[in-house]
Amino acid sequence: MARYRGPVEKLERRFGVSLALKGERRLAGKSALDKRPYAPGQHGARKGKISEYGLQLREKQKAKFMYGVSEKQFRRLFAEAARREGNTGVLLIQLLEQRLDNIVYRMGFATTRRFARQLVTHGHVLVNGKRVDIPSFRVEAGAKIEIIEKSKNNPQITRAIELTAQTGIVAWVDVEKDKRFGIFTRKPEREEVVIPVEERFIVELYSK
């Protein structure tokens, strides 16, 4: 399945949670989910009982859409997490968090992961001094992530940094906002990653 490219706020209404897809509108309380907190469609306000499989599938879809990955990418990451020693669900979340586009978002240089992905693909981001234009690039602990010189005054990046003052920066990155760079200091612990996803259902889905 290809990456979803439709109206992103419909996804949030479908799942009933914020997926951080419309950063500034969400912070201002103006997102579609804030205005209409029920699924889209004629019968969206009705809540039916969801099956176990439906619950598992929903959690997988939430994670996919939140991090902006395709089905193929998601399956590959899950397979890698399953091969490693440790909690598969936690390892999956850590692998998703290590994506370059996500790190750019976590450092506050973009209001959404979608915009962070655009910054990466358009060549606005350096990793340890080298330009990297692959959103799925895996960032290792200690890596320096920097906005290229000519883009440091980009108004959208500046606005994102201003909004970060409202939400704060996650504990596993150190950021020099004025200089437009940050260090990915370590992999996050699961309890530090505040996302509306219950990864145990994803593990159950792929373990069938």
Swiss-Prot record:
A molecular function GO annotation: rRNA binding
A GO cellular-component term linked to this record: small ribosomal subunit
CDD domains in alphabetical order: S4 (cd00165)
Every S4 RNA-binding domain range: 98-163
Signal sequence extent: none
SMART domains cross-referenced by the UniProt entry: Ribosomal_S4, S4
Pfam families linked to this entry: Ribosomal_S4, S4
PROSITE patterns (UniProt xref): RIBOSOMAL_S4, S4
Similarity field: Belongs to the universal ribosomal protein uS4 family.
Biological role stated in the UniProt entry: One of the primary rRNA binding proteins, it binds directly to 16S rRNA where it nucleates assembly of the body of the 30S subunit.
UniProt subunit comment: Part of the 30S ribosomal subunit. Contacts protein S5. The interaction surface between S4 and S5 is involved in control of translational fidelity.
Name of this chain's protein: Small ribosomal subunit protein uS4
Native species: Campylobacter jejuni subsp. jejuni serotype O:2 (strain ATCC 700819 / NCTC 11168)
